Amino acid sequence: MAKRKANHVINGMNNAKRQGNGAGYIENDQHILTEAERQNNKKRKTNQ
């Protein structure tokens, strides 16, 4: 079996264009969580 290059070595593989539409991180698109959602996130994190 031939050794395969890691994804971060392949040129452009980390670009959002390669990963499909909407893969880029949009900073101003953050929505503020309500208190209930925040509590739910804490529960989910402990379950992982």
Swiss-Prot record:
Gene that codes for this? sspO
Keyword list, A-Z: Sporulation
Gene source species:
Bacillus licheniformis (strain ATCC 14580 / DSM 13 / JCM 2505 / CCUG 7422 / NBRC 12200 / NCIMB 9375 / NCTC 10341 / NRRL NRS-1264 / Gibson 46)
Keyword Transferase present in the record's keywords: the answer is no
- Tell me which family the UniProt entry assigns to this protein: Belongs to the SspO family.
Q: What GO terms in the biological process aspect are recorded for it?
A: asexual sporulation; sporulation resulting in formation of a cellular spore
**Where is it localised?**
Spore core
**Name of this protein:** Small, acid-soluble spore protein O
GO CC annotation terms, alphabetical: endospore-forming forespore
Keyword DNA-binding (UniProt): no
Looking up InterPro entries in the UniProt record yields: SASP_SspO (IPR012613)
Report the NCBIfam families cross-referenced here.
Answer: spore_sspO
